[in-house]
Amino acid sequence: MIKVKFAVIGNPISHSLSPLMHHANFQSLNLENTYEAINVPVNQFQDIKKIISEKSIDGFNVTIPHKERIIPYLDDINEQAKSVGAVNTVLVKDGKWIGYNTDGIGYVNGLKQIYEGIEDAYILILGAGGASKGIANELYKIVRPTLTVANRTMSRFNNWSLNINKINLSHAESHLDEFDIIINTTPAGMNGNTDSVISLNRLASHTLVSDIVYNPYKTPILIEAEQRGNPIYNGLDMFVHQGAESFKIWTNLEPDIKAMKNIVIQKLKGEL
C-alpha cells in the first residue's frame, strides 16, 4: 500500500488537533497515511513550495495566519475558495497545487445534523471575515429567508456579492429576537479573549446561539446564552467536518467522521 502524506501548516501550530483527528480516521479505515503539523513562520513562507516538496506532501491544510497568504502560490483555486478569498485545503496533484475552502461546508454540514428545518430559519451571522463569508456562501444555497450578516465596520462588505442583509452590530442587537439562529464568527471568546461581541438582552428564548470556536468548548457568548436557557452549538463539528471534506478532496474516500469527532472530544475533555 502506498503511504500518502498529509500535513497542516500554520504558525503557531503545536497545539493543532488536526494530526490526532486525521490519524484516528486513517486508523479506522486501515490506511497507512501520515499527517503532520508543520510550523511555518511568516518570514519563511516564501519557501513554502520547497518545504512541502522536500517532505513529499500529497495534500495539506492551511490555518492561521496563512489562509490568504497561500493563494499566490497556487496553480488553481476552486470557486468557493476564490469567493471567500481564503484557502484551508490544498491538493497536490501532478505537481500542481489546487486550493479549496472547506470551512463553510464543514460548518453547515454539522449544523444540518442538529437543527431540523434549517431551510426556513432566519439566520444572523456575526462578523464579515473569511469564515463568515464561507458559511454564508453555503447557507445561501439552502436557506429560503434572506441571510443577515452583521459587522462592526460596513466596509468589510465591499467585496461581498451575495444578496444578503448587511447591518452593523448595534442594529443586530436591537433585532436579535427576529432570528432563529445566531452564529458568531468573530475572534471574541477565543482563548484569552473575553470580549463580548454583542448584547443578548433581546435574544428570543428559542434561538440557537452558535460559535465557530471549539476551544474553549464554551465561549462567553455560549455561556451567556446557555444561562438564559437557549440551545447552544460550538465549533467542534465544523472542525471535524472541514477536516472530513479535506480528506475527501485528497483521497476520494469517505472518512469515518465518528472516529474523528470522538478522538477530538476525548482530547478536549482531557484538557478542560
UniProtKB/Swiss-Prot annotation:
Reactions performed catalytically: shikimate + NADP(+) = 3-dehydroshikimate + NADPH + H(+)
Q: What GO molecular functions are on record for this protein?
A: NADP binding; shikimate 3-dehydrogenase (NADP+) activity
Which GO biological-process labels does this protein carry? Answer: amino acid biosynthetic process; aromatic amino acid family biosynthetic process; chorismate biosynthetic process; shikimate metabolic process
Alphabetical list of InterPro entries matching this protein: Aminoacid_DH-like_N_sf, NAD(P)-bd_dom_sf, SDH_C, Shikimate_DH, Shikimate_DH-bd_N, Shikimate_DH_fam, Shikm_DH/Glu-tRNA_Rdtase
Q: What are the binding positions for shikimate in this chain?
A: 16-18, 63, 88, 103, 214
The keyword NADP is annotated on this UniProt entry: yes
Pathway(s) the chain acts in: Metabolic intermediate biosynthesis; chorismate biosynthesis; chorismate from D-erythrose 4-phosphate and phosphoenolpyruvate: step 4/7
Cite a GO CC annotation: cytosol
Protein EC: 1.1.1.25
Active site (UniProt): 67
- Report if keyword Amino-acid biosynthesis is assigned: yes
Cysteine pairs forming cystine bridges in this chain are none
- Keywords annotated in UniProt: Amino-acid biosynthesis, Aromatic amino acid biosynthesis, NADP, Oxidoreductase
The UniProt record gives the binding positions of NADP(+) as 79, 127-131, 151-156, 212, 235
- Which Pfam families does this chain map to? SDH_C (PF18317), Shikimate_DH (PF01488), Shikimate_dh_N (PF08501)
Family that this chain belongs to: Belongs to the shikimate dehydrogenase family.
Q: How does it assemble?
A: Homodimer.
Give the function comment from the record. Involved in the biosynthesis of the chorismate, which leads to the biosynthesis of aromatic amino acids. Catalyzes the reversible NADPH linked reduction of 3-dehydroshikimate (DHSA) to yield shikimate (SA).
- Supply the name of the protein: Shikimate dehydrogenase (NADP(+))
Species of origin reads: Staphylococcus epidermidis (strain ATCC 12228 / FDA PCI 1200)
